[in-house]
UniProtKB/Swiss-Prot annotation:
Family matches, as Gene3D superfamilies: Dihydropteroate synthase-like, Sulfite Reductase Hemoprotein, domain 1
Lineage of the species this protein comes from: Bacteria, Pseudomonadati, Pseudomonadota, Gammaproteobacteria, Enterobacterales
Ligand binding ([4Fe-4S] cluster): 270, 273, 305, 312
Organism superkingdom: Bacteria
Protein name in UniProt: 4-hydroxy-3-methylbut-2-en-1-yl diphosphate synthase (flavodoxin)
Keywords for the protein's UniProt record, in alphabetical order: 4Fe-4S, Iron, Iron-sulfur, Isoprene biosynthesis, Metal-binding, Oxidoreductase
Entry note: cofactor: Binds 1 [4Fe-4S] cluster.
Organism of this sequence: Salmonella agona (strain SL483)
Reactions accelerated catalytically: (2E)-4-hydroxy-3-methylbut-2-enyl diphosphate + oxidized [flavodoxin] + H2O + 2 H(+) = 2-C-methyl-D-erythritol 2,4-cyclic diphosphate + reduced [flavodoxin]
Cofactor requirement: [4Fe-4S] cluster
Pfam families in UniProt: GcpE
């Protein structure tokens, strides 16, 4: 319900990872990566399905060996979300997973062998309509670039990326996206800015090895937020030393905060003070867990008193303003009811679910009318 101008996205070409469009104005895709042993098919499939349930558009799977490639075949048969195979050093693994229906190959052309082996992988990708992600990382820069620049710099990451881009250009292959990741926020941001000026391919964003759940989320929000606010980025991954499910949640939270892509409820809640009339923190924590299944975009404000509550409620889908024993409930900016403070969680959950159903039905009718 806010009316700020939308962020102007950088123009880029369009590729597809499975059925997911990437670039050229397509919704920014949110992805994660499994951290199970790929050869443990059951565990990997379960984790991929858990990621899909919280909204993952794409999932990357490490395929370091031929045994892992054979496991990948079984995994691919049991999931519906597009899969990216992460491959280094052995070109034969790339050829094998291509046979098994991989949706995207994450490689660096420079580390999978000589020109003939690179050509074999690219020709296979072209024949099977499989895109490639070039993944440059500050932690694995080529030795000559480390010697040339002394340390990872934006110019070093750009030069590395352009080497790999040139490999694919020489082979007339244009179905690829590029990433230039670093664990340092400023290094990553400046590297992406430079790259965005050099090529028009889709860019995959990430602050690599960002840290644990809290610190990693903060670094990613700052780094990715800066780039996204400048219109840079077509897919993203939040890299956390945590459950991969949290990566998807944080990724969508970043996009929601910038009003780029909405999924689920955007909770607005006060940090509380002695003026709060009900347990705001407990209410928000409970509702975030209970309502994770709702994917309908909604703004829900939960404010403990009348200082800021009415103002936030005016621009929320649903809003609660704390009052003595009963709190005001607003819907689309209009006060509609009063809720008992002692039963706030259950009452709000019921109202939010009802509103989500109402919005879903309205969208369904709109779609039917457009189709007519």
């Amino acid at each position: 319900m806010h009316n700020q101008a939308p962020i102007q996205r950088r123009k880029s070409t369009r590729i597809y990872v499975g059925n997911v469009p990437i670039g050229d104005g397509a919704p920014i895709a949110v992805q994660s990566m499994t951290n199970t042993r790929t050869t443990d098919v059951e565990a990997t499939v379960n984790q991929i399905k858990a990621l899909e349930r919280v909204g993952a558009d794409i999932v990357r799977v490490s395929v370091p060996t031929m045994d892992a490639a054979e496991a990948f075949k079984l995994i691919k048969q049991q999931v519906s979300v597009p899969l990216v195979a992460d491959i280094h050093f052995d070109y034969r693994i790339a050829l094998k997973v291509a046979e098994y229906g991989v949706d995207c190959l994450r490689i660096n052309p420079g580390n999978i062998g000589n020109e003939e082996r690179i050509r074999m992988v690219v020709d296979c990708a072209r024949d099977k309509n499989i895109p490639i992600r070039i993944g440059v990382n500050a932690g694995s820069l080529e030795k000559d670039l480390q010697e040339k620049y002394g340390e990872p710099t934006p110019q070093a990451l750009l030069e590395s990326a352009m080497r790999h881009v040139d490999h694919l250009d020489r082979l007339n292959f244009d179905q690829f996206k590029v990433s230039v990741k670093a664990s340092d926020v400023f290094l990553a941001v400046e590297s992406y800015r430079l790259l965005a000026k050099q090529i028009d391919q889709p860019l995959h964003l990430g602050i690599t090895e960002a840290g644990g759940a809290r610190s990693g989320a903060v670094k990613s929000a700052i780094g990715l937020g800066l780039l996204l606010s400048e219109g840079i980025g077509d897919t993203l991954r939040v890299s956390l030393a945590a459950d991969p499910v949290e990566e998807i949640k944080v990724g969508f939270d970043i996009l929601k905060s910038l009003r780029i892509r909405a999924r689920g409820i955007n909770f607005i809640a006060c940090p509380t003070c002695s003026r709060q009339e009900f347990d705001v923190i407990g209410t928000v924590n409970a509702l975030e867990q209970r309502l994770e299944d709702i994917i309908t975009p909604m703004d829900v404000s939960i404010i403990g008193c009348v200082v800021n509550g009415p103002g936030e409620a005016l621009v929320s889908t649903l809003g609660v303003t704390g009052g003595n024993k009963k709190s005001g409930l607003y819907e689309d900016g209009v006060r509609k009811d009063r809720l008992d403070n002692d039963d706030m969680i259950a009452q709000l959950e019921s109202r939010i679910r009802a509103k989500a159903s109402q919005l879903d039905e309205a969208r369904r009718i709109d779609v039917l009318q457009v189709e007519k």
